[in-house]
């Protein structure tokens, strides 16, 4: 049997797929790492995996960033044992909202910085998680007292992730 008759994808497609898979593995690793961290407050983690979504958006485009965010939540949740639990639902809602917000900001706000994109993603992530928790799990008015500090922490986290994304992107562009 001649193996030359099998179709081969172009090299640039293989490189793109390999880059996406490397980013996915990094995002999953950060998802698992963050799950082991003690929270900085109720429902708050630093959002390091969203940094990888932002890098995927910058380096590969919106479809790859969105699919990376989805794959990261599903596979990461499988590995930490939260797949199809309330934690998974909250994580999926927040991760998808962050990815969509970052894509929208990147596309429709001319001249926005990576920090700005990351800030909007972090705020969308937190607000969506908060709305998900409030609508599906905890219907208590007192829950709203937690929102201002959570949004403040999200802004800090979004700023740090945006700055890190800028640094990493500059290093990658320098080496490419």
Residue ranges and their predicted role:
Residues 48-64, 101-105:
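Generic transmembrane alpha-helix motif of multi-pass integral membrane proteins
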Residues 2-56:
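Hydrophobic transmembrane alpha-helices
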Residues 63-71:
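Transmembrane-helix signature of polytopic, membrane-embedded enzymes
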Residues 21, 25, 29, 55, ...:
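Generic alpha-helical transmembrane segments of integral inner-membrane proteins
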Residues 85-89, 104, 108-176:
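Membrane-embedded alpha-helical hairpins and interfacial helices in multi-pass inner-membrane proteins
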Residues 30-46, 71-100, 137, 142, ...:
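Interfacial aromatic-anchored transmembrane helix boundaries in multi-pass membrane proteins
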């Amino acid at each position: 049997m001649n193996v030359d008759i099998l179709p081969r994808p172009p090299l640039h497609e293989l490189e793109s797929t390999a880059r996406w898979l490397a980013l996915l593995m990094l995002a999953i690793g950060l998802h698992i790492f963050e799950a082991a961290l003690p929270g900085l407050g109720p429902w708050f983690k630093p959002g390091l995996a969203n940094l990888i979504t932002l890098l995927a958006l910058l380096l590969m485009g919106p479809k790859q960033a969105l699919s990376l965010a989805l794959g990261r939540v599903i596979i990461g949740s499988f590995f930490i044992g939260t797949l199809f639990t309330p934690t998974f639902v909250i994580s999926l809602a927040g991760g998808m909202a962050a990815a969509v917000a970052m894509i929208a900001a990147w596309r429709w706000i001319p001249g926005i910085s990576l920090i700005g994109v990351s800030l909007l993603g972090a705020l969308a992530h937190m607000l969506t998680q908060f709305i998900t928790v409030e609508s599906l799990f905890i219907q208590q008015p007192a829950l709203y007292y937690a929102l201002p500090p959570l949004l403040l922490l999200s802004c800090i986290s979004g700023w740090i992730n945006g700055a890190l994304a800028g640094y990493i992107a500059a290093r990658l562009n320098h080496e490419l």
